[in-house]
């Protein structure tokens, strides 16, 4: 069986996702699709618009065969750890032949070339990177500058203004990290990319003439009404959203504020909250009236909006250093969120070919620390979204789509 893996958030599932899924099937000529999807918290460091089971239903309606959960620890981390968690999970299933992801550039050879340099870390590249970090540049920017300088030094024939754009575009960054993880794992999975069409990943405005970003759809749902987003998502996705509730970002801010005020030392447990940003957050927590306001008061050249969002999310989820250290390792279980008949066949192949622990229903006995963290994340999410109850992870079985 020729199986393709895709890495998604579906927050929410829209027309761009539908196109990516269709094209992924075509370009890889696959027999089935496994989707690794973020759970109730996503890579921007925010609660998902709607819960992971509703989004699983969207994926299955769209034609995904098997949906598995990306553990929350990876799902709420930077591109490097997000990609490693997802790719290593797909790799450990021992049934995935291809991985297909979107990118702004659509050039798999360039993406592979850049990821190879990063993995091999030639000495000159490392020196350039060290120099840019000393200048105070945030790591992603320092790395992109070091890559360009290294390629220039090696007389690599390219348009460097184009290359700069490639290295600083959200989906390209993730694409490079996916390939980097494949190299590190010495995986036999073959990477494919599809050029992203329509609005920019970070574009927050809906436009009738193009495929909208998930950011724009979420903003529309939060600020006006769901009807405005109908033209930008499949009908099945819209119908599922129409009949569910959404996470409340104001409640998230209240919980983050409570966590910081009641225990200011919580920031010392998060390695990302260093270089004085911990003090800046504590100083501004009383001045801000919303999550957005707090982040804007604290952000700087080194600490971007999204990076701060992830720090605040880790405060909310009470992440500690011991837990964060687990991001270096591949998950040793796979949590099944849903499947169709073909997905059931793929599960049989996984059982036959892989030693990974397959989790269908949760037991209240002691489990893997990553899985325990997922359960805690869902319980915290239940304070933000009324459609989810405490202990939903124990109560809700994988969705079977017929």
Swiss-Prot record:
Q: What is the lineage of its organism?
A: Bacteria, Bacillati, Bacillota, Clostridia, Eubacteriales
Q: Which GO terms describe its cellular component?
A: cytoplasm
Q: Which residues bind ATP?
A: 7-20, 102, 171, 196
Q: What keyword terms does UniProt attach to this protein? A: ATP-binding, Cytoplasm, Ligase, Nucleotide-binding, RNA-binding, tRNA processing, tRNA-binding
Q: Which GO terms describe its molecular function?
A: ATP binding; ligase activity, forming carbon-nitrogen bonds; tRNA binding
Q: Name one Pfam family in it.
A: HIGH_NTase1
Annotated GO biological processes are: tRNA modification
Report the superkingdom from the record. Answer: Bacteria
What is the name listed in the Swiss-Prot or TrEMBL entry for this protein? Answer: tRNA(Met) cytidine acetate ligase
> What does the record give as the reaction this protein catalyses?
cytidine(34) in elongator tRNA(Met) + acetate + ATP = N(4)-acetylcytidine(34) in elongator tRNA(Met) + AMP + diphosphate
Q: Where in the cell is it found?
A: Cytoplasm
Q: What class of enzyme is it?
A: ligase
Q: What does this protein do?
A: Catalyzes the formation of N(4)-acetylcytidine (ac(4)C) at the wobble position of elongator tRNA(Met), using acetate and ATP as substrates. First activates an acetate ion to form acetyladenylate (Ac-AMP) and then transfers the acetyl group to tRNA to form ac(4)C34.
* Stored NCBIfam families: PRK13670.1
Report the EC number(s), separated by commas if there are several: 6.3.4.-
Family indicated by similarity: Belongs to the TmcAL family.
Q: Where does this chain mainly localize?
A: cytoplasm
């Amino acid at each position: 069986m020729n199986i393709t893996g895709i890495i998604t958030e579906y927050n929410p599932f829209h027309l761009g996702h539908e196109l990516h899924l269709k094209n992924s099937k075509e370009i890889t000529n696959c027999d089935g699709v496994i989707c690794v999807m973020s759970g109730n918290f996503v890579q921007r460091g925010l609660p998902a618009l709607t819960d992971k089971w509703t989004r699983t239903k969207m994926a299955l309606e769209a034609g995904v065969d098997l949906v598995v959960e990306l553990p929350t620890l990876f799902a709420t981390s930077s591109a490097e750890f997000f990609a490693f968690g997802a790719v290593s999970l797909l790799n450990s299933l021992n049934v995935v032949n291809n991985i297909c992801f979107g990118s702004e550039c659509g050039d798999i050879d360039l993406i592979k070339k850049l990821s190879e340099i990063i993995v091999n870390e030639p000495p000159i590249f490392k020196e350039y990177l060290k120099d840019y970090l000393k200048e105070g540049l945030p790591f992603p920017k320092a790395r992109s500058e070091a890559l360009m300088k290294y390629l220039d030094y090696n007389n690599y024939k390219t348009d460097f203004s184009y290359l700069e754009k490639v290295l600083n575009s959200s989906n390209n960054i993730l694409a490079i990290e996916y390939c980097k993880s494949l190299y590190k794992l010495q995986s036999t999975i073959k990477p494919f990319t599809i050029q992203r069409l329509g609005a920019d990943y970070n574009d927050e405005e809906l436009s009738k003439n193009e495929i909208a970003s998930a950011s724009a759809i979420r903003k529309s749902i939060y600020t006006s009404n769901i009807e405005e987003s109908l033209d930008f998502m499949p009908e099945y996705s819209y119908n599922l959203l129409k009949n569910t509730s959404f996470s409340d970002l104001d409640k998230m801010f209240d919980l983050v504020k409570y966590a910081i005020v009641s225990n200011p030392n919580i920031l010392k447990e998060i390695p990302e909250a260093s270089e004085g940003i911990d003090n800046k957050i504590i100083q501004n927590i009383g001045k801000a009236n919303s999550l957005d306001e707090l982040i804007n008061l604290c952000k700087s050249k080194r600490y971007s909006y999204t990076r701060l969002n992830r720090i605040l999310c880790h405060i909310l989820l009470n992440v500690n250093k011991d837990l964060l250290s687990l991001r270096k390792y591949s998950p040793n279980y796979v949590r099944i969120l849903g499947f169709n008949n073909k997905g059931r066949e793929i599960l049989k192949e996984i059982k036959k070919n892989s030693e990974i622990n397959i989790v269908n229903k949760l037991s209240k006995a002691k489990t893997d620390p990553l899985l325990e963290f997922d359960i805690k994340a869902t319980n915290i999410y239940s304070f933000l979204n009324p459609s989810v109850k405490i202990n939903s992870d124990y109560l809700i079985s994988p969705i079977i789509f017929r």
